[in-house]
From Swiss-Prot:
Keywords for the protein's UniProt record, in alphabetical order: Aminoacyl-tRNA synthetase, ATP-binding, Cytoplasm, Ligase, Nucleotide-binding, Protein biosynthesis
InterPro entries: Aa-tRNA-synt_II (IPR004364), aa-tRNA-synth_II (IPR006195), aa-tRNA-synth_II/BPL/LPL (IPR045864), Asp-tRNA-ligase_1 (IPR004524), Asp-tRNA-ligase_1_N (IPR047089), Asp/Asn-tRNA-synth_IIb (IPR002312), AspRS_core (IPR047090), GAD-like_sf (IPR004115)
PROSITE patterns assigned: AA_TRNA_LIGASE_II
SUPFAM superfamilies registered for this protein in UniProt: Class II aaRS and biotin synthetases, GAD domain-like, Nucleic acid-binding proteins
CDD domains membership: AspRS_core, EcAspRS_like_N
Catalytic activity, reaction form: tRNA(Asp) + L-aspartate + ATP = L-aspartyl-tRNA(Asp) + AMP + diphosphate
Name recorded for this polypeptide: Aspartate--tRNA ligase
Enzyme class: ligase
Lineage: Bacteria, Pseudomonadati, Pseudomonadota, Gammaproteobacteria, Enterobacterales
Region annotation Aspartate: where it falls in the sequence: 196-199
EC number: 6.1.1.12
Family the UniProt entry places it in: Belongs to the class-II aminoacyl-tRNA synthetase family. Type 1 subfamily.
Signal peptide interval: none
């Protein structure tokens, strides 16, 4: 038997037992002729003691260095009271070693366990980075989460059904990863951005409760919470309304948080998209942050300051304020930095009012715009925003989109910078009633979610006549400012589906080429169906307390979609390209021998 126990699971109940352990040397210490090591495996650490009287084991122990892979046999014994280490789970015991085997020696590690390593180094030597207890713990938590999800879904009558990885390219919002076909030369498969259409087809097939923990692929610009390949908890149901789907999925998440964190999230509030954007400047509001956007355009329509009155009198404009409690202490330099920050979102400046003594009216405030305000207007602003002495008001005045985006981002930054966000709390909610379409910047419309989302309470003819007013029967689950899941009621009418395609500018010919199989399936008694997909990686990220999705994926990609460890992507073998009838072109020239002209 290679091992009888895991290092990190030993405790006082094992005292007197002989155990065999396998793992790595985490640290070695020579203390006055005695040798101690901390031995590590996936479950944690335990202290091992080598006595000179056990000559063979002691001699071999003198050769040990960090990260040697070893096996040892010894007796568990209680530590003296004075030597108990309360910072270790195994701190009440130690192993008195009788026998030691060095399974494999280790060279000096390229990662330093005593300092912070660069992310580049951690990704290049990921197999070593994963030995760190905090990384191992995150992957253990991930495994615990997926096991919990499977049990929950099985208990609620959902069937785990796999869908294809090699499929057809369909427009779902991001670029596809393409896979060339050797058999069908000149043709390509696409790796799925989601199992969306296949799970809808499963509903049409009669499998009324489906789930799958599945890899998805999107060739898009990356950031801290995105990866080119990611994992979804994918769910679809038939004969369930949107509130019923939300109820089951909310139960899943509430029970998951209780299991992993011991936290009862309580009932999730439901907020419309319009309210979220109006109050928080985001469709995924972080409710731990108490700051809100307050509309004040009606109070500023008639003032002589055109920066305010212009947008206030424009149907497409917005003037809003954020009250920051205690913010009057901010320096001019800090305020200027916030002004530069919102320029990222198209804002042209950041007006402010410092409220020093509210009772004194205009004499009690400090502001470059105060000279444009009457006592009545100032009083109305302070009442509307509930401003108190010591507060500061920040204003945004521009198009509705610029103001909403800029103040929404400023709200989050202020919450972080001024420690207003309650970092140790959980604030989940549902966001519903999204617009079905949004302008695409080229005079057309694009689907805000995806083109298979059903509208709320509209006939195809009504949708075609006024698509801009359509509200999607969609819902997102948001926790602490992260969208952890999103779903919708799906279109189950061929007429409605084709109406949506036409609104999106997809011609009849394109509809047949790209979605003919779906349109055909919709002819044969399609049930009403709805679903949702959770981002597993984001859930694990939240539950393990990290803000980087790469910390919860065993072998992630960089923000440039590269694997530093395997050096993927790589150039293809020329023989393979020839077999696939593919010529690689770089800067307009065919690459020779699978290499670019710049190599």
């Amino acid at each position: 038997m290679m091992r009888t126990n895991y290092c990190g699971q030993l405790n006082s109940s094992h005292v007197g037992q002989e155990v065999t352990l396998c793992g790595w040397v985490n640290r070695r210490r020579d203390l006055g002729g005695l040798i101690f090591i901390d031995m590590r495996d996936r479950e944690g650490l335990v202290q091992v003691f080598f006595d000179p009287d056990r000559q063979d084991a002691f001699k071999l122990a003198s050769e040990l260095r960090n990260e040697f892979c070893i096996q040892l046999t010894g007796v568990v014994r209680a530590r003296p009271e004075s030597q108990i280490n309360k910072d270790m789970a195994t701190g009440e015991v130690e192993i008195f070693a009788n026998a030691l085997t060095i399974v494999n020696r280790s060279e000096a590690l390229p990662l330093d366990s005593n300092q912070t390593n660069t992310e580049e180094a951690r990704l290049k030597f990921r197999y070593l980075d994963l030995r760190r207890p905090e990384m191992a713990q995150r992957l253990k938590t991930r495994a615990r989460i997926t096991s919990f999800v499977r049990r929950f879904m099985d208990d609620h009558g959902f069937m785990d059904i796999e869908t294809p990885m090699l499929t057809k390219a369909t427009p779902e919002g991001a670029r596809d990863y393409l896979v060339p076909s050797r058999v069908h030369k000149g043709k390509f498969y696409a790796l799925p951005q989601s199992p969306q259409l296949f799970k809808q087809l499963l509903m049409m097939s009669g499998f009324d409760r489906y789930y799958q923990i599945v890899k998805c692929f999107r060739d898009e610009d990356l950031r801290a919470d995105r990866q080119p390949e990611f994992t979804q908890i994918d769910v679809e149901t038939s004969f369930m309304t949107a509130p019923q789907v939300r109820e089951v999925m909310e139960q899943l998440v509430r029970e998951l948080w209780l299991d992993v964190k011991g936290v009862d999230l309580g009932d999730f509030p439901v907020m419309t998209f319009a309210e979220a954007m109006r109050r928080f400047g985001s469709d995924k509001p972080d409710l731990r942050n108490p700051l809100e956007l307050v509309d004040v355009a009606d109070l500023l329509k008639d003032i002589e300051f055109k920066v305010f009155s212009g947008p206030a009198n424009d149907a497409k404009g917005r003037v809003a304020a954020i009250r920051v409690p205690g913010g009057s202490q901010l320096s001019r330099k800090q305020i200027d930095e916030y002004g530069k920050f919102i320029e990222i979102y198209g804002a042209k400046g950041l007006a402010y009012i410092k409220v020093n003594e509210r009772a004194k009216g205009l004499e009690g405030v400090q502001s470059p715009v105060a000279k444009f305000l009457s006592e009545d207007v100032l009083s109305a602003l302070l009442d509307r925003t509930a401003a108190q002495d010591g507060d500061i008001l920040f204003f945004g005045a521009d198009s509705a989109k610029v103001v909403t985006d800029a103040l929404g981002a400023l709200r989050l930054k202020l919450g972080r910078d001024l420690n207003l966000t309650k970092n140790n709390s959980w604030e989940p909610l549902w966001v519903v009633d999204f617009p079905m379409f949004e302008e695409d910047g080229e005079g057309g419309l694009s689907a805000m979610h995806h083109p298979f989302t059903a509208p709320r309470d509209m006939l195809p003819s009504e949708l075609a006549a006024n698509p801009v007013s359509a509200i999607a029967n969609a819902y997102d689950m948001v926790i602490n400012g992260y969208e952890v899941g999103g779903g919708s009621v799906r279109i189950h009418s061929g007429e409605m589906q084709q109406t949506v395609f036409r609104i999106l500018g997809i011609t009849e010919q394109e509809q047949r080429e790209k979605f003919g199989f779906l349109l055909d399936a919709l002819k044969y008694g399609t049930p009403p169906h709805a679903g949702l997909a959770f981002g597993l990686d984001r859930l694990v990220m939240l539950l393990t307390g990290t803000d980087n999705i790469r910390d919860v994926i065993a072998f992630p990609k960089t923000t440039a979609a590269a694997c530093l460890m395997t050096e993927a992507p790589s150039f293809a073998n020329p023989a393979s390209l020839e077999e696939l009838a593919i010529a690689v072109v770089v800067k307009g020239k065919a690459a020779q021998d699978g290499k670019s002209e710049n190599e």
